[in-house]
Amino acid sequence: MTEVELWSRETRAQRACAALVKNGFDAVYVKTAEEAADLVMQFVKPGMKLGFGGSMTIKTLGIQDKATQAGAQVLDHNKPGLGAEEKLDILRSQLTCDVFICSANAVTMKGEMLNIDGNGNRVAALTFGPKKNVVV
């Protein structure tokens, strides 16, 4: 990526972040994946119950593993070997967790987040339930 392309992306990201703040979100721009993971982990404390929306971004950042290592209780509805009823119980329990962590499908330059969901747990958690939501 050229220096101009990098500057353009960073400028757009900062403008979108400012628009999110204008719309009432607590939004922070970070430059690197490592900074993003570190910022998310500031919300994770030992013993907390954490829910996760299905997110390749969160998976790539290694947040679930880091949260487990930090002593948090990870409510993982994608854990191998779960039966349908067990998975549904975990999805429901994510609605009352301490922190729900997910990513947005898109963020507009007007400061709007777009979220589409297969199970409904991410959209439900973003609108009602968890004590705090962290969206990457």
Q: Where are the regions that the model predicts?
A:
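The feature marks the mature, well-folded catalytic cores of soluble enzymes
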Residues: 1-136
